[in-house]
Regions:
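Glycine- and aromatic-enriched mobile tails/lids
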Residues: 44-64, 81-88, 92, 96-105, ...
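Beta-strand segments within the central parallel beta-sheet cores of soluble alpha/beta enzyme folds
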Residues: 10-17, 149-150, 222-230
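Acidic, metal-coordinating catalytic segment for phosphate/diphosphate chemistry
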Residues: 1
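Short, charge-rich amphipathic segments
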Residues: 62-68, 126-148, 241-254, 275
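Histidine-centered active-site/metal-ligand motif
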Residues: 15-17, 153-157, 188
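Accessory "access/gating" subregions that flank catalytic or transport cores
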Residues: 123-175
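An anion/pyrophosphate-binding glycine-rich loop and adjacent beta-alpha core
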Residues: 7-138, 211-217
Length: 320
């Protein structure tokens, strides 16, 4: 949309889920349900300390326990005890984990530990958290009934996107472009509330469909067409990864892009790190022009990633 001339809004606002898998690399970012913490899972740093007690905001201190004894009692007596700080809102937990990792108290793979094995017996964990037990066993070879999980904040939702008319979902400055859902911006302000994405899709998805239909009707016989030259240029661009002389690996470059944005354009940002990020993104952009793809176009993830990198870099720069 940006390449076509559309305006974007709120691109700096990115929501992070506090607990995503951090290992192995192939599954990094897959969500770890909040039910783990709801069923007694505790967050600890590399020193074995439950650090969330150090990150309770003043506004929440009357509702969240400031010591382990009270926090543990809450699971059996919620009326007479304050909640464990692991159950603070997503943003607070994500910032706390990020702070621990940046302070050098993270796990070896850049996260923290989430442990439910000391709270519940093995059969109870499998009954209450069957998907999490299976997820970690199959993807990370970790048995959560006996071992802690390594988790860290993961990019969850981008509040920014295409600037659209709220009634028709039509994009400004690009006639014929309609956007709804996460690709559109301005709906959720700086932070989305849980569950609102589905409502957004239902309401504005319908408006986008109706708006597009009305737009097409208004064109009558004056519908725009793409010239043969434009089609040939798009086709040539599509095939570029196969014809390049470079030898950059799309997977390695994608991994580097993820690390740069996670480390420098993540939950807590400052001017120095953002400037550093933009410099590194420009370097990755130059190397992305040398990404080489092999094989055919169908069912070829490397080829698809080579094409996606161009847009990923554009989005990353917009956020930074």
């Amino acid at each position: 949309a940006l390449k076509a001339g559309s305006a974007l809004v709120d691109m700096e606002f990115v929501q992070f889920h506090p607990t995503g898998m951090v290992w192995p690399p192939s599954v990094r970012g897959i969500l770890v349900t909040e039910s783990v913490r709801g069923d007694g899972g505790v967050l600890t740093n590399s020193e074995g300390k439950r650090f969330m007690f150090n990150y309770i905001p003043e506004v929440f201190k009357d509702k969240y326990a400031d010591n382990e004894a009270e926090a543990d009692r809450w699971y059996k007596d919620q009326e007479n005890n304050r909640r464990p700080p692991e159950l603070l809102p997503r943003d607070e937990v994500a910032r706390a984990i990020n702070s621990e990792v940046k302070a050098g108290r993270g796990s070896p793979r850049g996260g923290v530990y989430l442990d439910v094995s000391k709270r519940l017996p093995a059969d109870e964990i499998k009954r209450r958290l069957p998907s999490m037990w299976h997820q970690f066993k199959e993807l990370a070879d970790v048995d959560i009934t006996e071992q802690p999980m390594e988790v860290g904040p993961t990019c969850h939702y981008v509040m920014g996107g295409v600037k659209v008319d709220p009634d028709t979902a039509a994009a400004y400055q690009v006639p014929g472009l309609f956007a709804a859902g996460e690709v559109a911006g301005g709906m959720h302000g700086s932070n989305r509330l849980g569950g609102n994405s589905l409502s957004d899709l239902l309401v504005f998805g319908r408006r986008a469909g109706a708006g597009a239909a009305e737009y097409v009707k208004s064109l009558a016989s004056n519908r725009p067409t793409a010239s043969d030259k434009e089609i040939a240029r798009a086709h040539s661009h599509l095939n570029e990864p196969f014809t390049r002389d470079g030898n950059e690996n799309p997977y390695a470059l994608h991994d580097e892009l993820q690390n740069v944005t996670q480390d420098l354009v993540g939950i807590i940002r400052n001017e120095k790190e953002l400037i550093d990020a933009l410099v590194k993104l420009e370097s990755i952009r130059k190397r992305a022009a040398q990404v080489k793809a092999t094989g055919g176009r169908a069912f070829n993830p490397g080829f698809h990633l080579a094409l996606d990198l161009e847009n990923m870099l554009l989005v990353s720069e917009s956020i930074a």
